[in-house]
Amino acid sequence: MDKQLLETAVGKVLEEMRERPIPLGISNRHIHLSAQDFAHLFPGQSISVKKALMQPDQYAAEQTLTLVGPKGKLEKVRLLGPLRSASQVEVSRTDARTLGITAPLRMSGDLQGTPGVRLVSPFAELEITSGVIVAQRHIHMSPLDALILNVSHGDKVSVAIKGDERRLIFDNVAVRVSPDMRLEMHIDTDEANAAGADNPQVCAMLVNKS
């Protein structure tokens, strides 16, 4: 095949792949616990799988906790596994107001200077001094996905979400690239409500780099 024809064909295929929908995951409030904090809150137990999540080796656990803040509480907040090196609580802005906590917008794992909250299980309770965040909206992807979409780890992109009755463009969507990741955009419940994205079939579409 002529080199120019080959390049044209490859370019067309890549363009079609760039226009494919991105699966959308709506993250409700949830908790990641360290092994030490899990052992304190659920003595003698092991974290147990309730449902596998889209990202490899990630799952919703059977165990839940109550979050207690200065102004209110949130019950039956799901624990996600596996256990981590540090406990982290991810809430929406609405959840944070219910608790009476000013939670900063952060990427997962960026916990320095974040507020804490009281965690209550049926067996014990624990006050963590930091770890509560509102998660920055982001897209997980593999290196191959990043190559196809022409983005790199740490980039910020704009993404369009078309709900049942609305279309909304989100700017400043962080790109997270890892060989262990599958293509999926994560937004919280406040963002999903704003976009009318309550249908599990709703997908996102990459618009451009922010």
Curated annotation (Swiss-Prot):
Zn(2+) 1 binds at residues 30, 32, 90. GO terms for biological process: propanediol catabolic process. CoA binds at residues 26-28, 71, 78, 193. Its cofactor is Zn(2+). It is found in: Bacterial microcompartment. Its EC number is 2.3.1.222. GO terms for cellular component: bacterial microcompartment. Phosphate binds at residue 84. The keyword Transferase applies. It comes from the Bacteria. It is an enzyme of class 2 (transferase). Its main location: other. Involved in 1,2-propanediol (1,2-PD) utilization within the bacterial microcompartment (BMC) dedicated to 1,2-PD degradation by catalyzing the conversion of propanoyl-CoA to propanoyl-phosphate. Formed by 2 beta-barrels, each is capped on both ends by short alpha-helices. Belongs to the PduL family. NCBIfam families: PRK15070.1. This is Phosphate propanoyltransferase. It comes from Escherichia fergusonii (strain ATCC 35469 / DSM 13698 / CCUG 18766 / IAM 14443 / JCM 21226 / LMG 7866 / NBRC 102419 / NCTC 12128 / CDC 0568-73). The lineage of its organism: Bacteria, Pseudomonadati, Pseudomonadota, Gammaproteobacteria, Enterobacterales. The gene is pduL.
